[in-house]
Amino acid sequence: MSASPDYKTNLLSHLISNKVLSFGSYTLKSGRNSPYFFTTTLLHTAPLLHATASACASVLSSPPFVTTSTPDGTPRPNFDIIFGPAYKGIPLCTAVLNELGVRDTTGAWNNISYSFNRKEAKAHGEGGNIVGAPLKGKKIVIIDDVITAGTALREAVGIIEKEGGTVVGVLVLLDREERVNDNEKKSAVGCAQRDLGENVPVKAVLSLSDIIEKLGNDIGEENLKRLKEYRAQYGAEE
């Protein structure tokens, strides 16, 4: 099971046709005027969720999330659980795990599980705030839509560590590749990588560079021009 070279183009096509990714003039929480907008609240149809899960599965089934130097030559995952932080990470972790299972022809992914957290701990039944596989003693990859200020990621790491798990990787759908603020030259993904350490890969399925390079003039010359200008003005130094 290896990454499809076309998964980025395929996903971008779905995101644009379903207006998950749109172009225009948008004011972000940071106050910046962005020429594009990405919202995962629209990831709720079967074709779109499948395209998203397929792209994520392509990344997670490739290095650095798998080990290729195995005795039988079969790539094997470096993690035990895909963790989706509530709420947007929940459909992602389940859909991506399902896609990995569908693709698997070797059994290498048979023991990989999903898990997510409740915002409020359950006081009855099994109790607690974790749904899915127990995290204790397990290696965890966190999957989410984006990293903005890093607050949600830090909370997810805290939950996992409190439950006795170890974060070994992070995958997000989009890296905007822009500086967090005027005092921080790195992007949100870059900051997360710095904070978690070089041994914990933080990767994105798509980036602003992918949008520019793979779509080009298909999004219109003016939109392309504005994207390049935005990157030149706010681009991060990794």
UniProtKB/Swiss-Prot annotation:
Give GO MF terms, alphabetically.
orotate phosphoribosyltransferase activity
- Kindly state a single biological-process term from the GO annotations of this entry: 'de novo' pyrimidine nucleobase biosynthetic process
Tell me the name of the encoding gene.
URA5
Described purpose of this protein according to its UniProt entry: Catalyzes the transfer of a ribosyl phosphate group from 5-phosphoribose 1-diphosphate to orotate, leading to the formation of orotidine monophosphate (OMP).
Segments spanning the bilayer are none
Q: Which residues bind orotate?
A: F37, F38, T148, R176
Q: What's the catalysed reaction? A: orotidine 5'-phosphate + diphosphate = orotate + 5-phospho-alpha-D-ribose 1-diphosphate
> Any idea what this protein is called?
Orotate phosphoribosyltransferase
Highest rank taxon of the organism: Eukaryota
Organism phylogeny = Eukaryota, Fungi, Dikarya, Ascomycota, Pezizomycotina
